Amino acid sequence: MDHPSREKDERQRTTKPMAQRSAHCSRPSGSSSSSGVLMVGPNFRVGKKIGCGNFGELRLGKNLYTNEYVAIKLEPIKSRAPQLHLEYRFYKQLGSAGEGLPQVYYFGPCGKYNAMVLELLGPSLEDLFDLCDRTFTLKTVLMIAIQLLSRMEYVHSKNLIYRDVKPENFLIGRQGNKKEHVIHIIDFGLAKEYIDPETKKHIPYREHKSLTGTARYMSINTHLGKEQSRRDDLEALGHMFMYFLRGSLPWQGLKADTLKERYQKIGDTKRNTPIEALCENFPEEMATYLRYVRRLDFFEKPDYEYLRTLFTDLFEKKGYTFDYAYDWVGRPIPTPVGSVHVDSGASAITRESHTHRDRPSQQQPLRNQFSSSTNQTSNLK
């Protein structure tokens, strides 16, 4: 299948957030080029590689003025499908007011690369799922779901659809940080404006679109080649919630001779799996959620509050306390910066969004601190 080219406080810091390029990419005076010390912008030192993807590399970095660790995404300027600048533009469009979005500190050229410097976060939900023996309790899933509905509502309020729901793209904050309990959304490399910036109208309904996203979680309509809109992000979230509760989804592990055939099998199995069967032995609210989002019209604005209330009412009915005592709390979490615990955020970037998978992930732990890829494609997970 062809991969479409995209349509596409904690502390005060000395650098302005979202500072755009000033063509800084240098080696600090006193350090020889052979030392491998590289600077991005006026004060970000580039450190070890902590991930990679089709877009380039993810590096651990350090703000030499504040001594804070950061994540640095490097994309070759001559990339065949450059997307880092577009992702930066989407981060600017989202702004810094929304909860659960990484801070972006800098964007600019760096030698043969474009570089984006972001807040270093903790591990991804996929990493934590592995840590918890690949099953989350209902309480943990509901705390995740309630937050992610708010994240997606915020993204949609900024005229963007996300189009890349997968556990690797949702990260907790760094351990010891006041935001360590917050579920963050990262990697806007496949995002798209669903409101035309010129006409201010919703994009038109189209068919025969190439797949964009991760096959395991994408909506049924995406498999059918239909243009994505807000409803598809919410359906993909529903599939991910059931993945966390069940441990796997019925359309995982399907074999086929070609990627196109495998996508077809995944879509067919998804369509032929009744919601009742998918959600069997779990609270009815999970099935109600999926029925609602699958019935939404292409242009329709979802009732986010109704969906959140489904889950908050269930949460209260079960007698849970929203104390952020997730299943992974108390378990040791590896980190890319040695003793600085959960910076695990520095998980590796496996934006397989550009390599296709449909089997249990076999990446090293902490795959997705900023798993942004730069190509758009569907991930067979």
Curated annotation (Swiss-Prot):
GO BP terms in the entry: Wnt signaling pathway
Compositionally biased spans, kind Basic and acidic residues: 1-13, 351-360
Active-site residues, Swiss-Prot/TrEMBL: 164 (proton acceptor)
Reactions performed catalytically: L-seryl-[protein] + ATP = O-phospho-L-seryl-[protein] + ADP + H(+); L-threonyl-[protein] + ATP = O-phospho-L-threonyl-[protein] + ADP + H(+)
UniProtKB keywords: ATP-binding, Cytoplasm, Kinase, Nucleotide-binding, Phosphoprotein, Serine/threonine-protein kinase, Transferase, Wnt signaling pathway
Complexes and interactors: Monomer.
Name of the protein in its database record: Casein kinase I isoform gamma-1
The species this protein was found in: Macaca fascicularis (Crab-eating macaque)
